[in-house]
């Protein structure tokens, strides 16, 4: 490869690395917003729900908090260990989402809207975390 070609490749690689870092920062901000939205939706659901649905909402809030902590740690220090913790937190979000979905049909009509909102927020959060994992 000629010297000019090598320089061009180096410049493009440097530009892509800079874009990637900025994209990762934006992705982190998007994940934080999704975490806040999910937390708000789950708090609303927990305030309206009773029995097993309230318990499932509490599990989901715990899972969202775990995901927040794992996401922060992963952004600060993207190691194999923090990546695994983030993957575990995503799997837990998957589990609590399924738990909430199973309760949807039996949920009182007045709570279904909050439950749908919580499920939508959890889905968005799970997608953001997956993008964070895929982008790093």
What are these regions (language model features)?
Residues 1, 15-17:
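Long, low-complexity interaction regions most often at the N-terminus
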Residues 1-8:
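Bacterial N-terminal signal peptides that target proteins for export
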Residues 8-15:
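Bacterial N-terminal signal peptides
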Residues 18-23:
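Bacterial signal peptide processing site
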Residues 33-40, 44-136:
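Surface-exposed, polar/charged faces of alpha-helical domains
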């Amino acid at each position: 490869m000629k010297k000019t070609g090598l320089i061009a490749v180096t410049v493009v690689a440097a530009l892509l690395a800079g874009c990637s870092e900025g994209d990762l920062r934006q992705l982190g901000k998007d994940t934080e917003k999704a975490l806040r939205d999910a937390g708000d939706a789950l708090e609303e659901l927990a305030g309206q729900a009773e029995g097993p649905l309230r318990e499932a909402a509490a599990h989901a809030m715990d899972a969202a908090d775990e995901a927040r902590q794992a996401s922060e740690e992963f952004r600060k220090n993207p190691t194999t260990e923090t990546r695994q913790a983030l993957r575990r937190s995503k799997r837990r979000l998957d589990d609590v989402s399924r738990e909430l979905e199973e309760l949807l049909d039996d949920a009182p009509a007045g709570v279904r809207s909050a439950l749908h909102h919580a499920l939508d927020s959890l889905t968005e959060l799970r997608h953001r975390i997956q993008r964070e994992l895929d982008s790093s």
